[in-house]
Amino acid sequence: MTFKVYYQADKTKRPVRENTQSLYIEADSEAEALLMVEHNTDYNIEFVEQLDEKALAYEKQNPNFKLTTF
């Protein structure tokens, strides 16, 4: 399954919506995706969203789409 993880790059600053970034990751569950990002980054994770087929197809249209691997 593919997940979109919304995060703030700096844990020390107050989250600001305009600074939210995202990455895409393959995992077996939402919990696994969350743990993978938590253990491999210093990001302040805001939300983890599972992408269905239509949402994934839409996200792939973005030229910046890239699956993150750790």
UniProtKB/Swiss-Prot annotation:
GO terms for cellular component: DNA-directed RNA polymerase complex. It is an enzyme of class 2 (transferase). It catalyses: RNA(n) + a ribonucleoside 5'-triphosphate = RNA(n+1) + diphosphate. Keywords: DNA-directed RNA polymerase, Nucleotidyltransferase, Transcription, Transferase. Gene3D superfamilies: RNAP, epsilon subunit-like. One of its GO terms (molecular function) is DNA-directed RNA polymerase activity. InterPro entries: RpoY (IPR009907). GO terms for biological process: DNA-templated transcription. Coiled coil: none annotated. Its EC number is 2.7.7.6. HAMAP family: RNApol_bact_RpoY. RNAP is composed of a core of 2 alpha, a beta and a beta' subunit. The core is associated with a delta subunit, and at least one of epsilon or omega. When a sigma factor is associated with the core the holoenzyme is formed, which can initiate transcription. Belongs to the RNA polymerase subunit epsilon family. A non-essential component of RNA polymerase (RNAP). This is DNA-directed RNA polymerase subunit epsilon. It comes from Limosilactobacillus reuteri (strain DSM 20016) (Lactobacillus reuteri).
